[in-house]
Amino acid sequence: MATSTGRWLLLRLALFGFLWEASGGLDSGASRDDDLLLPYPRARARLPRDCTRVRAGNREHESWPPPPATPGAGGLAVRTFVSHFRDRAVAGHLTRAVEPLRTFSVLEPGGPGGCAARRRATVEETARAADCRVAQNGGFFRMNSGECLGNVVSDERRVSSSGGLQNAQFGIRRDGTLVTGYLSEEEVLDTENPFVQLLSGVVWLIRNGSIYINESQATECDETQETGSFSKFVNVISARTAIGHDRKGQLVLFHADGQTEQRGINLWEMAEFLLKQDVVNAINLDGGGSATFVLNGTLASYPSDHCQDNMWRCPRQVSTVVCVHEPRCQPPDCHGHGTCVDGHCQCTGHFWRGPGCDELDCGPSNCSQHGLCTETGCRCDAGWTGSNCSEECPLGWHGPGCQRPCKCEHHCPCDPKTGNCSVSRVKQCLQPPEATLRAGELSFFTRTAWLALTLALAFLLLISTAANLSLLLSRAERNRRLHGDYAYHPLQEMNGEPLAAEKEQPGGAHNPFKD
């Protein structure tokens, strides 16, 4: 019995030990944040740079026009490389994404509101929530507080501001233009063509196809360059990440594994590598232990930070994340005037147009320059009417769309735009509707009466003509019977002697009855 009790006690102790190890294993999953690669001295409480804030004006930057849409083209290409840099083997990933306006996003740590909450999260956690196909760590942040540094615009939401401090920026404007370089606060806040995605890095690596590191060092931080720390940040080998675009306007993400001062690459080597990949503009993002690459929600890189158990390496909880996802509509809700289908807005209504369903189009005539195009059609100016506002108001009406009747004396017409009564147009006065109706009825009845009278007279004339003709024919027939044809036969005596009257008639006398 004692033996079984002892065995049970040992079993319980073993189980307790297993659970303790398991809990310890969970604790060991947290990064120690020990591979730090900072561009500026850690002891100095400062924002990303000490240089003067630029509130207004145009700063040096490059704008690349949005690439044309290529239906059916592959949206994402991820290449894995192992390259040698001065006899050092370096592994990493190069990602290209077409149509960055619809396939790329800057994400706050852990989702929307992460910067305001000063939240930190691993790239995996943030990427899974946003369905990222490829994700990397993004901009710089304060290790002790989690504060997002620099400018951050995430899906059109401005969540962090640098206040005009001049660090390298990469962003996408609403029309798809890719912007790389230095921006004033005024340019960041532009509302005519605002940024939909924007984040800050440190060091402009490549500008318009040329390495720009020296110029960037002088521009971004004069004072810290003297301390040597910024120079070390540029030249030390470490894990690195970058973002930019190529000549086709495709988004390019770069990631290289490493550990500060032990393995990896420096900024010069990274810039040269990117140039060989036809990258035109690129900036450097957070590196060192922050460098993380996640593919389809799974960690695909080798972190340099140690876990709580030094035997293992763990991904660091970082701030912003750059994400490549399936094509999305821009904006996702199509401005409330359409439905997003396969990354393209299908606009509702008859007049909403444009990639984001935010443009009103009332046809080629554009309301004939006499009205305003609205979501229900043309809203005509005063004095005009019709579906495209091409018709002037009829007499007696005025105002927008000719919806108001004139109120002039004697029903005179008014100005079709203002409704003012015009004395010079008295001759064009209109009759009252009742008078017009009575006149119309009278005219109608008069025409009907005249038509009936004309038909009656014609009928009587026809009857009279027929009667006269019948009477004439009847009289002719009677005369023919009374004075019909006959032959004259002279009378003779029975003895063959002529009558005495015939004898007495002279030979030259004319006999009217003789042929």
Swiss-Prot record:
Disulfide linkage: 115-148, 132-323, 307-314, 362-373, 380-389
PROSITE patterns: EGF_1, EGF_2, EGF_3
Effect of residue 491 to A: Interaction with AP4M1 is abolished
Limits of the EGF-like domain: 358-390
Segments passing through the bilayer: 449-469
Enzyme's top EC category: hydrolase
Function as written in the Swiss-Prot or TrEMBL entry: Catalyzes the second step in the formation of the mannose 6-phosphate targeting signal on lysosomal enzyme oligosaccharides by removing GlcNAc residues from GlcNAc-alpha-P-mannose moieties, which are formed in the first step. Also hydrolyzes UDP-GlcNAc, a sugar donor for Golgi N-acetylglucosaminyltransferases.
Protein name: N-acetylglucosamine-1-phosphodiester alpha-N-acetylglucosaminidase
Originating organism: Homo sapiens (Human)
Gene name for this UniProt entry: NAGPA
